[in-house]
A protein has these predicted regions:
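Leucine-rich, amphipathic alpha-helical/linker segments
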Residues: 10-13, 17, 26, 93, ...
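N-terminal interaction modules that seed assembly of large macromolecular complexes
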Residues: 19-75
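Short capping segments at the starts of secondary-structure elements
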Residues: 29, 115-118
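Short, positively charged loop/turn segments that connect secondary-structure elements
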Residues: 50, 128-148
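Positively charged, polyanion-binding regions of nucleic-acid-associated proteins
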Residues: 87-90, 94-116
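Accessory, usually C-terminal, subdomains that scaffold auxiliary metal cofactors
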Residues: 141-206
Length: 206
């Protein structure tokens, strides 16, 4: 697991799946910097009218892109429309330490408890614990903290781990073996699979 800095907070823009797909050819190009600069100015592929929002989206997507290997993004492009959002969730957990902490310390724990639900208040408690040991996070405004919590819960709903009543459910994913093959078995637990389910998938690859 890559050591992620707590300062890599998700700074807005949200999930950005369609925008990621639009920007990938630019990021994969040898003329990346020139093409991204042109996109910031001319809005050729993102179709985000406000320049400030466009710059933020390019920054976030570039950060996520650089977290992963070029080979991963080649794989990403041939995944199905159902698999790509889950793969992007995987990338986000790898990119943003704060989201990874929320997921491991709150969501997975609550899934393994009687509750099997996650609400804003549960995430806020974890935020307060992080703030107590990290001065940088402690310096964030309440509005910023609220945005980060909202972004995380929105991501969970978008990929289907969290329903409208805040109940957690196992993520329905058709390419779980892929994450085992690239040495990221922790992600299956992040998708709320039980150990016996993970073992069954491992055995199918043997």
């Amino acid at each position: 697991q890559r050591q992620m800095c707590i300062r890599d907070r998700i700074t807005g823009g949200g999930f950005l799946l369609n925008e990621t797909l639009a920007l990938l050819p630019l990021l994969q190009s040898e003329d990346r910097e020139e093409l991204l600069k042109d996109e910031r100015l001319n809005n050729r592929v993102l179709m985000i009218n406000a320049e400030t929002s466009r710059k933020k989206a390019i920054l976030e997507i570039s950060r996520r892109y650089d977290t992963m290997s070029p080979a991963f993004w080649q794989d990403f492009l041939v995944m199905t429309a159902a698999e790509q959002p889950i793969a992007l969730f995987f990338v986000m957990l790898k990119t943003y330490k704060i989201l990874f902490d929320f997921h491991v310390n709150v969501t997975i724990r609550r899934w393994n408890s009687v509750a099997k639900s996650v609400k804003r208040e549960d995430i806020l408690m974890e935020f307060n614990e992080i703030s107590a040991r990290d001065a940088f996070v402690d310096s964030w405004s309440e509005a910023t903290k609220d945005k980060v919590i909202s972004a995380y819960l929105s991501i969970l709903r978008k990929i289907g781990i969290l329903d409208r009543t805040n109940q957690l459910q196992v993520l329905d994913c058709t390419n779980y073996p892929y994450y085992l093959q690239i040495g990221e078995s922790w992600f299956l637990e992040a998708c709320l699979l039980q150990p016996y389910q993970i073992e069954k998938i491992k055995n199918s690859l043997a």
